[in-house]
Amino acid sequence: QKCNYNYLGEIGENELLAKSSLSPSSLIIVDTRKAARKLYKKISGKKYHLSTYMTALDRAIILKNIRKELKCLEKEFPDFKNVPEERQITIVSTSLIEAGVDLDVYTVFRELKGLDNILQAGGRCNREGKRKRADVFVFELLDSKKKAISVEMDITRDLLKKYEDISDSACIKEYYERIFSLKEASISQNTMHCICDNFRYIPFKKYAENFELIDSRTVSLVVPRDEKSRQMVADLKYKQTVDERKLQNYTCSLYKNELDDLIKQNVVDDFGTGIYCLTNLDYYDEELGLLFEASDYFL
């Protein structure tokens, strides 16, 4: 067991940050980009922020800097004792850091989610098993505007209270058995062959309307922050053509209603191509990512 999983229950932002400040390096993972941004602004000292409001290129640069800082910290303080406050590292991120990101921090704090998310978050703590004790703290933010409670969250909360080690195979087995049991009726009801035995009468239109492979509420926005990306946007504007694959590193994601707000502020244009570009870079910050008002950074 590389990590000890601890359930903190409901906790305020200030209390959470006070607890994370006791660790030489900590990773705080929250469910929304706005929550990540709010926490990041409250932190003093060496800090990093990651969310999909930032371009893929900026996220890659920040991750590179984080890895470098963590290696320097471990080299200078191999036992992680008596680390001065100015050398402590705090990372605030959304769940994007849970998938395929190679980081090893001293302590992880994960907002309550499904068991799979929490175990993935734990994979960013004591990855190589060098320390005898490493902690993952699971919390629920007090006064959070986002109070969407899911089946997965309810079951995970129960299991955190029931099992000493939630990474144990018995706990994982119970988690998926309980989810399947609760969702079995819905799965059966929405299975194509259960609804209609005759192929000719399968309501394909209805299935197409209900099926979403990717969350269609989110859209991509190009942020041209260097000469290469500015030239690609110029080609898009004047030649109406561009290699979209090359633009991927310069894109961030946002909700459709957020894009609409930026369009109303005249800071986004697609030049008639359907590929939206940020035309006012005062609405982007390399630490926070996309801003929805030019004054957002100072709030």
Regions flagged by a language model, labelled:
Residues 100-102:
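Conserved P-loop NTPase nucleotide-binding/switch module
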Residues 79-98:
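Conserved two-lobed SF2 helicase motor
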Residues 107:
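Conserved phosphoryl-transfer motifs of two-component systems
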